[in-house]
Design a protein with these regions (language model features):
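Low-complexity, intrinsically disordered or signal/transmembrane-proximal segments
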Residues: 7-8, 15
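Catalytic, metal-anchored helix/loop core of enzyme active sites in primary metabolism
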Residues: 14-416
Length: 416
């Protein structure tokens, strides 16, 4: 079986301008994508954008990029944006809102490539509809593959269209596997920085503050993903993503702690050879790779090889970071368990950030939610979303119980 890295491509269309949609245009991935478009104006054109709740940035982007469609979160904001665009003489721009607005952005007939970067399951329906509409998709949204990876990858195979990972680790795996066959792969190694608590004794975890948990040693990211990195749940999600993207069982996806974050992933082959991908820690590089695949084009991003002094690796401590263990269990079960893992984590992290529960309660909420989730496989996106809603309800009840029965130390809340 050939890896899902080869697709029929139109040689004549390979080098023409790529017309893109950005789901999550005001977030960090969206801004990095627009930076690339700005650097390569002869290569890319922005056709549509989903801006979420950031009305000010949406207006500025609409004026600058002049997309055919722009979507915002709420109907009220859509009305305001439409009026502002009319005043600016840009009334030709179609303004949409809500989940269906995201779908309109992702499925616009002029779009070739969709960058899926809306955080959470809010981007799930639009991403699936983009795949269903025959678009090539660059995935920066972990939740899509964690919650509905089986459905999305199956549809991509039906459409014979690529799902190109933007997540740096999976992008690295994709590059290492390029041109290979799945039978040749012994295992995949996903590297983890270890987060801010790599060397913190487990005995001190009870007093971890939000401020400490948000202090990631390598990456500057959003709050949820930064907390997920602190618990290693982010790496657990990546295990599930890798299983779905590369059609491999969980036992072939390994996590290795690599504090320098120099190597993004490694692929070990059956003959004992190991390929590793090294690059600067700049998300523009994996985005550029996804946007230009199967080509590679020149960029100014360079890794200073001469400054490389050491590479450290050691196995993760599953007892210290139980979220990683829970993710492997969910990866093995798939279906509703994976959905519940993501939903419960989002609820638990939000509660921790608010100071309602302690850092150690995050895996407790997730594990209890998984216990209360029946093992089955939703067969449609609507059923996935329904399962997600139920899991969130369960997780909220568990959080409420913990908040009522435990006294959260002031040190566990963000210092105000």
């Amino acid at each position: 079986m050939v890896l899902c890295l080869r697709y029929q491509t139109d040689e004549l269309n390979l080098y023409r301008m790529k017309r893109i949609a950005i789901l999550g245009s005001t977030g960090s991935i969206g801004r990095s994508t627009l930076s690339i478009v700005e650097s390569y104006p002869e290569r890319f054109a922005v056709i549509s954008m989903a801006a979420g709740g950031n009305l000010e940035t949406a207006l500025a982007d609409a004026k600058l990029w002049k997309p055919k469609v722009i979507s915002v979160a709420k109907a009220e904001d859509a009305g305001k944006l439409k009026a502002q665009l009319q005043s600016a003489g840009l009334d030709a721009i179609q303004v949409e809102y809500g989940p269906q607005g995201n779908v309109a952005v992702a499925t616009h007939p002029d779009v070739d490539f969709v960058v899926s970067a809306i955080v959470g399951v809010a981007g799930l329906e639009a991403t699936y509809e983009a795949v269903k509409a025959g678009k090539s998709v660059g995935l920066a949204n972990k939740e899509c593959l964690v919650a509905a990876g089986e459905l999305i990858t199956a549809e991509a195979r039906r459409q014979n269209k690529p799902l190109l990972p933007i997540d740096s680790e999976h992008n690295a795996v994709h590059q290492c596997m390029r041109g290979g066959r799945i039978e040749e792969v012994e295992r995949v190694w996903l590297t983890a920085s270890g987060g801010p608590f790599l060397h913190t004794p487990k005995s001190q975890f009870a007093s971890i503050t939000v401020k400490q948990a948000l202090n990631h040693p390598t990456w500057k990211m959003g709050k949820r993903i930064t907390i997920d990195s602190a618990t290693l749940m982010n790496k657990g999600f990546e295990v599930i993503e890798a299983c779905r993207l590369f059609h491999m069982p969980p036992e072939k996806i390994k996590v290795i702690v690599h504090p320098q974050s120099t190597i993004h992933s490694l692929v070990e082959f059956v003959d004992g050879s190991i390929l590793a991908q090294l690059s600067v820690t700049d998300m523009r590089l994996p985005i550029l790779y996804a946007l230009t695949w199967p080509e590679r084009i020149a960029s100014e991003l360079r890794f200073p090889v001469q400054e490389l002094k050491r590479l450290d690796f050691h196995p993760p401590d599953m007892e210290k970071f139980p979220c990683l263990r829970l993710a492997y269990e969910a990866a093995e079960a798939g279906g509703a368990k994976s959905i519940a893992l993501n939903a419960a984590d989002e609820v638990a992290v939000a509660a921790f950030l608010e100071g309602s529960i302690a850092f150690l309660d995050i895996p407790r909420v997730i594990e209890q939610t998984l216990r209360e989730t029946k093992d089955h496989h939703p067969e449609s996106i609507s059923k996935v979303l329904s399962e997600d809603s139920q899991a969130r309800h369960t997780a909220v009840e568990i959080v409420d119980h913990l908040a009522k029965t435990k006294v959260i130390s002031p040190s566990a809340a963000l210092t105000r």
